[in-house]
Regions:
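Residues that line or immediately flank small-molecule/substrate-binding pockets and catalytic motifs
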Residues: 112
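Conserved small/polar residues in nucleotide/adenosyl-binding loops
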Residues: 118-124
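N-terminal capping/small domains of soluble enzymes
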Residues: 1-106, 115
Length: 125
């Protein structure tokens, strides 16, 4: 049974969840989307492989998130959707959501705290 989200049909209604540090990266999310599902990247310490992560973790995380969203979309070959899981309770929540949307994420999944994102979703319009 296909599912339609924001006008895009997922022939395989599988939503891969965000799985934290080093698991839900571009390769996994892109592969799930390429099969017709929704692949999800996690914002949790996503820049840990960046060379300057120890000295500039905030910038490294946002740079890595941007790159991973863009690369996952390439790996998906136009199929499926790419989502980003952002924990509300983190200090980087708003910046992570903005970065993900600007990079082309199709959806944002929020958890770990009270949600206040209405003003951020206007970036997609």
């Amino acid at each position: 049974m296909a599912v339609t989200i924001r006008g895009k049909t997922l022939p395989l209604p599988i939503l891969q969840g965000g799985m934290g540090v080093g698991i839900s990266l571009d390769g996994l999310a892109g592969a799930v989307a390429a099969c017709g599902g929704m692949g999800t990247l996690s914002t949790a310490v996503c820049g840990f492989q960046e060379p300057d992560f120890a000295k500039r973790p905030f910038e490294a995380n946002l740079r890595a998130l941007d790159r991973q969203v863009r690369h996952a979309k390439v790996l998906a070959h136009g199929a499926g959707l790419i989502a980003v899981n952002a924990m509300v309770a983190t200090t980087q929540y708003a910046d992570s959501v903005r970065t993900a949307l600007r990079a082309g994420a199709d959806a944002i999944v929020c958890g770990a705290g009270p949600v206040s994102y209405t003003h951020l979703t206007l970036l997609t319009i």
